[in-house]
Amino acid sequence: MSHNGVRDIDTSDFFSYERLLTDDERHLLRAVRKFMTTDVAPVILEHWSRATFPSEVVPGMRELGIAGLPYHGNGCPGRSYLLDGMIAMELARTDCSIATFNGVHGGLEMGSIYLCGSDEQRERLLPAMARYETIGSFGLTEPQVGSGASGGLQTTARRDGDTWILNGQKKWIGNATFGDLTIIWAKDVGDGQVQRLCGEKPLAGGHRRKTAAQDRVAHCAERPDHT
């Protein structure tokens, strides 16, 4: 099947959303599939057996330019959300861990900075993240309350001059074992509001513990606990 002279590819796209992509977007989708087949598939089983992330594939992802795909400016590609979702599906087709890594880095972390950060933060942080030179991790989930950010967070943040003091536990922090930049969500003891605190590695006074057993699906996605 083809559309506007560009051959469609099988993406398990039961509702034919791929037809809504432009030719350029379809070419990128095809390039992602080729990368996952030729670069990721041959190495992923060995990493799966060790529950380690295949960092050697990150340069290839940099060449594809798929981090923070739907965001505009500061080095971000400014592509469609539809393309972003379909690329996530292509990553997960070969291994869910790669989709998790990119979703945490380019979606949760870059998205938080893009939507909630200051102009200075966006200008300073997003370009290097779009190039995968700075890897982001994301700390929301907690052992006792899951991801209940609206009212259940138990981790607290207390302002001390120009710094914040965090107290609490986080669980399943995507990319935290090797990430350069971590966003921690915590409740401000001053006003009870949820704050987004962005810290560079290593977070002072913190302790990271790699979980003893990764789940079977995203087995190579390193998501440690943090205290």
Task: Go through each PLM region and give its residues.
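Intrinsic disorder at enzyme termini
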Residues: 1-24
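Mature N-terminal segment immediately following signal peptide/propeptide cleavage
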Residues: 19-39
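Short secondary-structure junction/hinge motifs that connect adjacent elements
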Residues: 42-64
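Internal helix-loop-helix
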Residues: 63-135, 174-181
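Short Gly/Pro-enriched turn/cap motifs at secondary-structure boundaries
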Residues: 144-148, 172-175, 187-188, 214-221
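Flexible, small-/acidic-enriched active-site or ligand-binding loops
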Residues: 152, 202-227
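A structural signal for short hydrophobic beta-strand segments in well-ordered beta-sheet cores
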Residues: 155-158
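A short core secondary-structure module
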Residues: 162-163, 167-208
